[in-house]
Design a protein with these regions (language model features):
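Terminal "cap-and-tail" regions of soluble proteins that handle hydrophobic small molecules
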Residues: 1-18, 26-27, 55, 94-95, ...
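Short beta-strand edge/turn micro-motifs at domain boundaries
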Residues: 102-122
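Residue-level signal for tight coil/turn positions that link beta-strands
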Residues: 79-81, 111
Length: 122
């Protein structure tokens, strides 16, 4: 079974290569919980639980935006968690407008899978 460090490094490498949804699908546990600081556009709740709801949240987000550029610091691993600092440019698919977006993401790993992802941004 992969360690938290193994998961963190592979997951982060996938993100760096633009494989955002594939990284989630590879590592999300069936009972994953995803936590945002606020509700998302499209009626997506700030907290969703389960792999189906988390995939739907991800598909909704990537349906409205694309990541044009990303710089990731980390992973910073402690115990069963790892954190990433992500600095990116996201582009609205409808308007074509881009903006800088920074976030901290904290992931909890159990049995080689991500059981919680928690995002911090304003």
């Amino acid at each position: 079974m992969p360690t938290t460090e193994n998961v963190a490094r592979d997951f982060t490498d996938m993100l760096r290569h633009g494989q955002f949804q594939a990284a989630g699908e590879k590592y999300w546990a069936d009972d994953v919980t995803s936590v945002e600081p606020m509700n998302l556009p499209g009626g997506i709740a700030a907290v969703v639980s389960g792999i189906i709801a988390t995939k739907a949240k991800s598909e909704s987000w990537f349906g409205g935006c694309r990541i044009e550029d990303i710089c990731i610091d980390g992973p910073f691993v402690t115990g069963d968690q790892f954190a990433l600092f992500m600095d990116m440019v996201i582009v609205n698919r409808v308007s074509g407008e881009g903006r800088s977006f920074d976030e901290i993401a904290l992931y909890t790993v159990r049995n080689g899978q991500i059981t919680e992802e928690r995002y911090f941004y304003d």
